[in-house]
Every structure is written in structure tokens, then in C-alpha cells.
């Protein structure tokens, strides 16, 4: 719990401005409970399932929506705090690559960073244009919830996180999410579904350096985690509100990147889903 309090102080420090707190904390919480404010969606899916392509399609179809992409560049280039004499920051390493190369050593560190970066994104103030819009939408590429119930959970189950690391992670994860509960509420999940084999093919095609050591077995594990949560409903969730969030399942087995007809179908399903939220 001490770790949770320390992280909480750091987060609160980033939102210290009285004006910002007045705009973000109470009104945002009231808006969420009153049914007002932006609809908050999260896109979930396996590694290389096509989330980035889908996000670009969403942004093209709905330029009025605010879309927050996954902060991969931050994970690939960890910078030391404070500037050096020349005004630059010291580069500490590529944590994404380090995690894949030595999962037993770096998984806890990586999951701490990934959770904190997602949390900060989801806590960012609502832009004025969204507050003024009649029907505004915020979209997040993955969430603080999948960080725990998909990725960290899987790393624990495959032995990359120790018992004590998993216990500590869950402790401060629960503490922080309870502390910021009103500001992290989601109205819907969009689950992009494809087989591990399809994801493996797309992973090879995008040829990201850090992912060259990923094996099919790992994608199969993550696929099972997604299916257990979004399809089979067997994942034990510790936040009651999360258990009732609607899920739109989109089959993205077929490559839709240059298929206009399939793109139209997918966006039609999204629009129908949004109307029912």
C-alpha cells in the first residue's frame, strides 16, 4: 500500500493546478454519473491484431473524436529525469525490448511503466471542444484494465512475474484505480478479434525490432486471456462497474487496411454500438 500512496502523490502532483482540479475532478465525476460528458471507449486486442490500423480508420471516420494511441515510443526510449549540461536527457534504454529479451528480470518494471503511462493518459483533462460538443467521444488504445487483466495476469501465469511481484502490482493497481474510479470509468470496449496465427502473420509483416523474439505460444496465451474476459466472461474482475461495461466484438481476421467495403462494415458496427451506449 505504501507503493500505492507514493504513486498517488506523484500523480496528484501532475494535477496540482487549482484551476485544472476544478475543471477535471468534481465536474468530470458528476458528468460521468449524470450520463453527460464524453463517451469513453477502449480498443482492446492481441499484439499485431490491427489496432493501429483500426485507430487510423476511426480517426478518419470520426475526426471529431479524441483518440489516444498507445505510448509505445515512450517505452522504447526511457529518458533519465532532469536534463544534462547540453540540455538533453540521458537515454536509459528500450524497456520494451528489455522486457521481451529478459521477461523474468524486466516484466514487473515494464508493467509498472505501462500501467502508469496508461493511467496518465486516461486522467488527462477533457479538451474544451469535447466539453462543448453535444456527442463527444474519447477513445483509448488499450486501458489500465487490460494492463492488469490481460498482460500482467498473463506474465504471472507464465512465470515472468513472481508471486510477490504480482501481489504488489495488484495492490497498488487496485488502490490507484479505486482512488481515481470516477475518472477512469469506461462506457464500452471494442474487442478486435483474430486468431493467434493471423496476429503472428501481421507481426512478421510489421517487423518491429523488439518483437522479433515473440513466439506463437505467447500470442496464444494473450488470445486466451482476451477470450476469457470478453467472450467467455470467466476472468475474475475486481471492479464492479467494469463487469457491466458493454463489449463490441469485431472480427478482424480479414485484412481491412485497404478494403473499403470491410472498413464501411466495421465503422457501421461501431456507429450502431455507440448509438446504444
From Swiss-Prot:
Its EC number is 2.7.1.113, 2.7.1.76. Coiled coil: none annotated. GO terms for cellular component: cytoplasm; cytosol; mitochondrion. Keywords: ATP-binding, Cytoplasm, Kinase, Mitochondrion, Nucleotide-binding, Transferase, Transit peptide. Residues 1-39 form a transit peptide. Substrate binds at residues 70, 100, 111, 118, 142, 147, 211. It catalyses: 2'-deoxyguanosine + ATP = dGMP + ADP + H(+); 2'-deoxyadenosine + ATP = dAMP + ADP + H(+). One of its GO terms (biological process) is dGTP metabolic process. SUPFAM superfamilies: P-loop containing nucleoside triphosphate hydrolases (SSF52540). Spleen and thymus. Expressed at much lower levels in the brain and liver. It holds the Pfam family dNK. It is an enzyme of class 2 (transferase). Belongs to the DCK/DGK family. Phosphorylates deoxyguanosine and deoxyadenosine in the mitochondrial matrix, with the highest efficiency for deoxyguanosine. In non-replicating cells, where cytosolic dNTP synthesis is down-regulated, mtDNA synthesis depends solely on DGUOK and TK2. Phosphorylates certain nucleoside analogs. Widely used as target of antiviral and chemotherapeutic agents. Homodimer. This is Deoxyguanosine kinase, mitochondrial.
